[in-house]
């Protein structure tokens, strides 16, 4: 504003000087009486134009209030060792058993610009390190079994009880093996007809198909955070920071308000010699008011994202509340094109660090479902 006014004043004085020179020149040329009216008219016109220009120029510098996302603060500082300690704090939990809500999100139609969210189901989960899991998923209210899955850390079994015949089966496999997606799982090639909308009748089949593609070890690694081995000479940790704009979900936030959240990003790299390294994991730590593991990403040998886990809503777990853990976990498998959201119903009632017999994590085909052994396919 001040700069615009200065420019305006300078132009005004310059043109006054110009008008004076015009009149003086006219007097010298003997045309004073012809110019005594033309000169002032010229000067007045120039000054009016300058006044309008100055006014419009000033308007461009008028202060306006613009809403911008505010940074969530305070931001807590931490070094790499403190970030590793936060991960290993979560990794101290040996076992969990609790009631959960499970919701699937089928991303098969992502190329159509949509994703289908299935109805929430109820579940009971038992998790134990290393890699032990038993999960039963039931329909709400009626308690009908939709699926069961188990793993003893080396082999897994998945039983699907609902849906069409091609979905109902008993699947066996090895945790460390990579398998092709089974026929009948959520579709790989989406049909984008009808503006990308699928028929409602397909919803249950899609849900069961997503269950068929779920592997117990993916579930275990998401809910029981693996520890980090800071003493491993082959691992390199690189810390950086990131700022992400998001919807303000605080209780008193205005509708539609947005904020900026600060993160530390810790890359876990494996040295491969000759000045090369492979990215194994990327860990995101929320810095607002404390240090909290907020996201965990895993990558394969080609650098492709294979697992993306988001952690929210930290709560006290167990009767004694000795552990503060995320009560909401969202697991995304981009290559398998599905997401799974798990929410603990009552974190305070979750059994923590109990010992479970080995048979807990083995599933038998008691209902004579069609068996599929992935190691023999």
Predicted regions and their residues:
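An acidic-aromatic
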Residues: 130-218
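One face of beta-strands
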Residues: 94-102, 121-125, 129-135, 147-149, ...
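Gly/Pro-enriched, hydrophobic low-complexity segments
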Residues: 58-59, 212, 228-230, 235-367, ...
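Hydrophobic lipid-interacting interfaces of membrane-associated proteins
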Residues: 101-107, 140-142, 154, 158-164, ...
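Sec-dependent bacterial lipoprotein signal peptides
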Residues: 2, 10-22, 26-58
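N-terminal leader/targeting segments and the immediate start of mature chains
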Residues: 58-119, 203-213, 375-377
């Amino acid at each position: 504003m001040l700069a615009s006014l200065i420019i305006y004043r300078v132009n005004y004085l310059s043109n006054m000087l110009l008008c004076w020179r015009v009149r003086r020149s006219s007097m010298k040329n003997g045309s004073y009486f012809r110019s005594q009216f033309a000169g002032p008219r010229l000067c007045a016109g120039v000054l009016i134009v300058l006044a309008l220009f100055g006014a419009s120029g000033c308007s461009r510098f008028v202060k306006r209030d613009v809403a911008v996302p505010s940074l969530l603060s305070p931001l807590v500082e931490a070094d790499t060792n403190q970030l590793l300690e936060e991960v290993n704090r979560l990794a101290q939990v040996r076992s969990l058993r609790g009631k959960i809500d499970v919701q699937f999100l089928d991303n098969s139609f992502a190329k159509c610009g949509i994703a289908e969210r299935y109805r929430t189901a109820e579940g009971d989960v038992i998790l134990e390190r290393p890699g032990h899991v038993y999960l039963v998923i039931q329909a709400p209210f009626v308690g009908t079994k939709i699926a069961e899955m188990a793993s003893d850390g080396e082999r897994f079994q998945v039983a699907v009880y609902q849906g069409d015949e091609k979905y109902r089966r008993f699947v066996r496999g090895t945790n460390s093996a990579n398998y092709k997606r089974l026929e009948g799982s959520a579709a790989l090639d989406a049909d984008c007809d009808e503006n990308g909308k699928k028929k409602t009748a397909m919803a249950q089949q899609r849900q069961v198909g997503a269950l068929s593609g779920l592997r117990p070890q993916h579930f275990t690694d998401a809910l029981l955070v693996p520890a980090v081995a800071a003493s491993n000479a082959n691992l390199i940790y690189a810390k950086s920071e990131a700022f992400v704009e998001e919807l303000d979900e605080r209780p008193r936030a205005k509708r539609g308000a947005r904020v900026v959240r600060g993160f530390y990003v810790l890359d876990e790299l494996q040295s491969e010699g000759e000045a090369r390294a492979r990215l194994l994991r990327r860990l995101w730590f929320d810095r607002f008011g404390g240090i909290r593991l907020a996201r965990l990403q895993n990558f394969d040998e080609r650098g492709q994202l294979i697992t993306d886990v988001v952690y929210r809503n930290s709560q006290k777990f167990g009767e004694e509340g000795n552990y503060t853990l995320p009560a909401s976990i969202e697991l995304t498998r981009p290559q398998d094109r599905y997401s799974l959201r798990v929410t603990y119903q009552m974190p305070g009632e979750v059994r923590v660090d109990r010992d479970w017999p080995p048979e807990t994590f083995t599933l038998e085909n008691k209902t004579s479902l069609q068996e599929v052994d992935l190691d023999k396919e």
